């Protein structure tokens, strides 16, 4: 009898405990949902108050050299840079190894840039680990050296890498990292991707990429899944010319899309679109960056990505050898690209988008949606208040 009474009491207490746990989970979910609603409302309010020129400017991330006429790598802030950023209201600046000399210089440059603006911006860098590490490969920065992603096989290590990189990036003032690489390496001849990929297993690539996303964003640094729709099955280098993937849509759904789905499931803030053509999917050689079917139809609609879609650098050979900066900018925006990275000529690209809105070539709703996505992430990461 005593055993029965004890068992009943245990069941009651356990049941109460479970109810409390469920109640706490419900409270946390409710708080998260409320926070998301507030961010949504605030983002809409900010976007509604922006001029069309300010909205268009938010859609560009450029190098600081775009505003500097010395012909030298920018390592210190100048009035020209501040004036240029404010003239175009750009959404972000990307720094490369040439801009990053040592910690204090980097912090001062970033703080000076942010302190000169009406709208706070993304400060971006390519910091994947391995051979693509603008900071990690600079001995003066004194940060942990991260192995190539091809060597990462443990989800705990992947998350740790995200935390490590996110920590030193945020301490320096960066808030956007063009990482992780979510490409599945299905063609070993692909040296452009090579050991930047987690390998040829789509599920493993997805698991590792998702954990790095979580680690980076835990430290307040936006992650970028790249290079959609999947650059691991190409042989040529899109920095030099147009790359082509022979994959069919079924192939991509079964392999290439898997890491992106998993990274999106981990709530990656960004996805980067690649300058590769997929003729068996689109029917022509249009780069994915300029394809509405790929960017809007597949990435945003089929995969349900609600964050920011950024192009790969618009000054790469795949684009500049086939399109002018104005034409490429308009096509990319209409395809669904939210941020244009490093156009060959900022003034031409900016004015092409601006004029495209005014003459109806670009729907106003497309610009509003892009700007809303951008501002929402800036609010989420505390870049905007």
Where do the protein language model's features map onto the residues?
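Positively charged n-region of N-terminal signal peptides that target proteins for export
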Residues: 1-4
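Preference for extracellular/luminal or secreted protein segments
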Residues: 13-87, 301-302, 320-385
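Extracellular glycoside hydrolase catalytic/binding regions
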Residues: 245-254
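Catalytic PLP-binding core of fold-type I/II PLP enzymes
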Residues: 296-309, 313
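Enzymes and membrane/adaptor proteins characterized by extended Gly/Ser/Thr/Asp/Glu-rich
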Residues: 65-75, 84-205, 227, 232-246, ...
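Bacterial N-terminal signal peptides
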Residues: 6-14, 126
